[in-house]
Amino acid sequence: MALFHSCFFSDVLGMQSRAEVILPDRLEEGRPLPTLYLLHGLSDDETIWCRHTSLELYARGYYLAIVMPNAHRSFYLDSDDGSTRYFTYISEELPKLMESFFPLAKEREHRFVAGLSMGGYGAFKCALAKPERYAAAASFSGVLDFDHAYRNWEYLSTVISEETAATAPTNIIDAANKLAALSKLTPEIKIPKLYQECGTEDFLYESNIKFRDNALSNGLSLEYHERPGTHNWEFWNECIRKTLAWLPLQTESNKTTAIGV
């Protein structure tokens, strides 16, 4: 694998930004790379996935690019006053930039997003708010009950109002409800496939159960896993290995894995 440290200017953020990018050793001419956007948690940065997991080793088996952006402590939110627009940056500007820098596939069916904790929230928000852009999303120990998060993290009230926090797309349970309802009225809408995993001893476990039950009751395509574990890298290291196997990716043996296998 090749690891690129990229620095570039973001017009949306109005500042320099960074992303780590993993690419296969060999690129096939005329065959752009499927891409996984892998998001970090509240206290992390763009380097954390490579430093704390065996991501590069796991990725060696797949024809895939992995983009790990820095979103600081943004919660992947667009602020009410417009001063910061991290959701717009992650879901719209970043893919366009990466697709101009690297030979990445631009089709929805080849674009995926995943993340841990705050990043798990960001991943599901991207998929549920912009289903036309992502084929699949995965959340590991995600902050999936945004009402609860808003009540417990005072920082969030400095970025968005209580009204914004309670409704889609910020509130992803509300976003899931609206997308499910819309898909019943407009069957041609493609809903991303979702993968969710959380440790049974994680402080976010109850929030994850709430999202799971709501998503399944709405008929969303969600694969849910739980196992003993807390909010730590030992748990997430296994999550990312399993997620790479779950995504519909071309392997070194030239066999495409199927979502859900």
Task: Annotate each predicted stretch with a short phrase.
Residues M1-V261:
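Non-catalytic cap/lid and distal C-terminal segments of serine-dependent acyl enzymes
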